[in-house]
Structures are given as C-alpha cells and as structure tokens.
C-alpha cells in the first residue's frame, strides 16, 4: 500500500511515467476545443487536472480513494480556490466535453458496459472519452507467470483478471470498444499493430455518438 504523497512523488520522479503522461496530456489537450470542460475520472493526485486547468479548461475531478483525494486537494489548492478545478463526489455531477482516465483507471473495472453507461450522460454528443489502459499484449510482461497463464484467455475471450489485492483486469481493445457501444465509438488506438508488443500502456479514444 502507498500514501497519496508517495504515489505523487513516484509518478513525478519516474522518467517512464512522465513520458507516458506527457503523451497522454498532449493528446487530450490537442483534442479539446478551447475552454472546453473536462472530467478527470480517477484523477489520482491531480497531476493531469492541474495541467488541463493551466491550459484554460474547467476541470472536474472524481477520485474515490481518500489518500489520493487528500493529496489532490493539496496539489491543486490554488486551482480549487479559484474553481478552475472542482472536486465531485460522482461523475454525474457534471456534463463535459471530455472524460480522461489516465494510468489504467479503467483496468480497475470488470464491467465496462456499466462504466460506459454511467459516463454516457456526462459526455456531450461529439465529445470523447480518452483512456489509458494497461496493454495486454506488451511482451515485457511475458516474464511473469500470470501473463503466460492468461494468454489463452486473452486470445479466446479478450479479457482476464490478475489475482491480486487490486484485482486488475486486462482487456483487448475490441472488448473495450464493444462495451462502449452504442454510446461511444472507438475512433483511435495507439499504439497499433506491432507497436502493441512494446508499450506498457495503450491509449483509446472513444467518441460520443
């Protein structure tokens, strides 16, 4: 277990995670119209939220973990004071152009059908969900017994769960896209093809229809 502060310092100090975050933020900010509101779903300690607010986007943050939320309130104190960042107890408390979920937030949910159903009234038509999920095809994980044991499940079902305290679920992109319909349509996947063998995270852009 870790505290919010420990997680915050680790994420800021990890070159790999900083690079992943930079790519995710660049993609999100490039997709958002000027001044558009965004919900940071599973906002963690508010690192992304602070960046969105700095670029002029009213940012709502939903974070169920108390330790993370406490750190977020400290990290985004100035933004919260001027209402550039607003904490919400439920995603349904806002209506936005985009929902972002960075660093495997969606991997904590077994039922993506229910998740996208919940998010559908939050995102305006034409808006989007941008999610960073753990890549089930990453060959760097092949050294782990659980990856090899679940490879057949991935091929057959497109989904498996890792036995652990956090019960992380891994999904093939097609399974996420199927769960998102009919509310969202998969518009972009990065990386694609052979690139999926080398990246720990995959970015899915799902458009509200």
Predicted segments with their positions:
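Conserved class I S-adenosyl-L-methionine
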Residues: 1-32, 35-44, 51, 130-155, 199
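A short glycine-rich, Lys/Arg-flanked "PGG" loop and its adjoining helix->strand segment in the class I
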Residues: 113-125
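A short acidic, Gly/Pro-enriched loop at the edge of an enzyme's catalytic core
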Residues: 91-99
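A short SAM/SAH-binding and catalytic strip from SAM-dependent methyltransferases
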Residues: 98-112
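Short alpha-helix
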Residues: 164-184
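Class I SAM-dependent methyltransferase SAM/SAH-binding core
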Residues: 45-82, 86-87
């Amino acid at each position: 277990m870790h505290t919010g502060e420990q997680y915050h310092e680790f994420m800021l100090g990890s070159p790999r995670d900083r690079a992943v975050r930079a790519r995710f933020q660049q993609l999100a900010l490039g997709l958002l119209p000027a001044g558009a509101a965004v919900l940071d779903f599973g906002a963690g300690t508010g690192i992304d939220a602070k960046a969105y607010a700095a670029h002029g986007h009213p940012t709502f943050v939903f974070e169920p973990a108390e330790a993370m939320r406490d750190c977020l309130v400290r990290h985004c104190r100035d933004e919260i004071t001027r209402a550039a960042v607003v904490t919400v107890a439920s995603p349904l408390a806002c209506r936005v152009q985009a929902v972002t979920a960075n660093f495997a937030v969606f991997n904590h949910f077994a039922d993506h059908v229910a998740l996208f159903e919940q998010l559908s009234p939050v995102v305006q038509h034409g808006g989007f969900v941008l999610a960073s999920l753990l890549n089930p095809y990453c060959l760097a994980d092949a050294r782990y017994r659980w990856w090899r044991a679940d490879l057949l499940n991935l091929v057959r079902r497109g989904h498996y769960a890792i036995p652990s305290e956090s019960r992380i679920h891994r999904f093939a992109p097609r399974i996420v896209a199927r769960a998102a319909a009919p509310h969202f349509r998969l518009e972009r996947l990065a990386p694609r093809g052979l690139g999926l063998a080398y990246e720990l995270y995959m970015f899915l852009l799902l458009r509200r229809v």
